[in-house]
Amino acid sequence: MGRYKKRISRIVTIAMLFTFLVGNSNMVYAMGATQVGYASKYITVKGNNMHLALYGKLDASGETFAEEGKTTLVMMPALGVPSPHIYFKPLAQSLDESFNIVIVEPFGYGLSDVAAMDRTVDNINSELNAALDTMGIKQCVLLVHSISGVYGLNFVQNYPEKVKGFIAVD
């Protein structure tokens, strides 16, 4: 009975490894002229690293969008979401052919640094504005969830030239 369990265990392990490799193979690809997919990007905002997940048609570097004229959808998470990227991933994947998508992981969320500054609405929006500037995003549609709605409304008020549209999800 012990040999049988070991054999089953090996088969299950190999199957899991195979599933993992095949499931993640879309992340391992050669860089072409343009590509539809996902890129993980770190930018420096006010001396800290902020993580962004980019979905859509990316340029050869994978760092920016290939179709600059396409509407950019910026997604902001609810309070306490441990990984905004994972949280918004299914939605981003369903919309990435129609939009350039940026999932923002604000300081203290996901793979971004812990915030050095207080988490006030003004500070969070100043950081978001700096992130958009760093990415060269002049206008976007904000998609906000829960508490980010408060940040988003304040962002619209303080940076109206940057906001093309506003979507609140709860």
Language model features: what each stretch is:
Residues 2-12:
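Bacterial N-terminal signal peptides that target proteins for export
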Residues 92, 132, 155-156:
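A conserved amphipathic alpha-helix that caps or lines the catalytic cleft of carbohydrate-
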Residues 47, 69, 97, 133-139, ...:
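Active-site acidic short loop of glycosyltransferases
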Residues 138-170:
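Conserved hydrolase catalytic core segment
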Residues 103-141:
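Active-site loop/oxyanion-hole signature of alpha/beta-hydrolase fold enzymes
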Residues 16-22:
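Hydrophobic core
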Residues 51-111:
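Conserved HGGG/HGGXW glycine-rich cap/lid loop of the alpha/beta-hydrolase fold
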Residues 22-36:
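Sec-dependent signal peptide cleavage junction
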